């Protein structure tokens, strides 16, 4: 489905009447893992949304938004006028996306795996009607694995970062919507009394340059009281990299180790 973000109506107009051409984009991912299928999947998880923002002379002329319910998901089609265009494309499985085409941002209530690319192109009558487009991962993943025994009463695991990014500037691909709100997950009751099974992954939008943040990882009971916590300083994050911490949370004096996931861009390990 397409929506105009300017007063340039391209819908229901024949290409030859407007000096325009229908262009279909075949969207793929480039992140050192299996490439997108037509269901747009990465690391075994399907993307849920795809946006294409079409700009002419720095003005947005149309937005195409697809969801995973569309039969042509991953192959959006645009009617593009002849001349120079800038296209910005985002694919994500983030939660509750909020698109602002004035500020050119997408902000999610929960960040998940997300891919982006932006490029310039010139459309003529000779332009191929199908174009392949490769997107790049623009998230960091912070994974925390708890190795020691989970005590009775543990209900949630809470990660509270000093800095976290919930949005992307879809023109530049840079992170936006900085926040320090905590992110929590429920601990399954079947995990109580077990060791080495509790792990949680948290995603943030990131740029290509490494940055750091402090965070607190806490276990809470059903009354929201803290059972145990650990503070980690200077956790290194960057796009297309998984930063992995593992160690003891409930044992006194426990330390956490750190790694970078080799299934993503590179490999790295730390201790807390």
Q: Model-derived features: where do they sit?
A:
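Extracellular beta-sheet/turn segments enriched in Thr/Pro/Gly and aliphatic residues
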Residues: 105-138, 143-147, 231-272
